[in-house]
UniProtKB/Swiss-Prot annotation:
It comes from Arabidopsis thaliana. This is Signal peptidase complex subunit 3B. InterPro entries: SPC3. GO terms for biological process: signal peptide processing. The chain crosses the membrane at residues 12-32. Belongs to the SPCS3 family. GO terms for cellular component: signal peptidase complex. Residues 1-11 are cytoplasmic.
Length: 167
């Protein structure tokens, strides 16, 4: 006969093995979900565009963000982190990213939204590189599952340009 300790160890090992197997299947099942998020971002107004006293350019924008991220949610999704970034190139850096807005979306019911806001975070370039600059607005998202690996993706919207003169 085996002692109580041996039996408890066998039962615990079996339970952990089954739990690991269920987690692996849950993570694997996310690969079969049909994800087709959509988004549109409009710049409604440039509130101000100025040069700060220490020489950096700063922009304040009013954005209209429309997104449908409901297809990112499966039974294994805990939450989705979404953010909008302005992306542009300068002579010193091939890619500059400035986060303008972000949100944590906890449920599928909140994943379809329309908001009109001024940028939540300051759009500042370290230098004076923003006058007349073309830039993209990109909606990034990170899907955080209950079990398994996180994944991220984005939608890039191009064709935006800042004015040539400060306002």
């Amino acid at each position: 006969m085996h002692s109580f300790g041996y039996r408890a160890n066998a039962l615990l090992t079996f339970a952990v093995t089954i739990l690991a197997f269920i987690c692996a299947i849950a993570s694997f099942s996310d690969n079969f979900s049909n994800q087709n998020p959509s988004a549109q971002i409009q710049i409604l107004n440039i509130n101000w565009f100025q040069k700060q006293p220490h020489g950096n350019d700063e922009v304040s924008l009013t954005l209209n963000i429309t997104a449908d991220l409901q297809s990112l949610f499966t039974w294994n999704t805990k939450q989705v982190f979404a953010f909008v970034a302005a992306e542009y190139e300068t002579s010193k850096n091939a890619l500059n990213q400035v986060s303008l807005w972000d949100a944590i979306i906890p449920e599928k019911e909140h994943a379809k939204f329309w908001i009109q806001i001024s940028n939540k975070y300051r759009f500042i370039d370290q230098g004076h590189n923003l006058r007349g600059k073309d830039f993209n607005l990109t909606l990034h998202w990170h899907v955080m599952p209950k079990t398994g690996k996180m994944f991220a993706d984005k939608i890039v919207m191009s064709g935006y340009r800042l004015p040539n003169a400060y306002r």
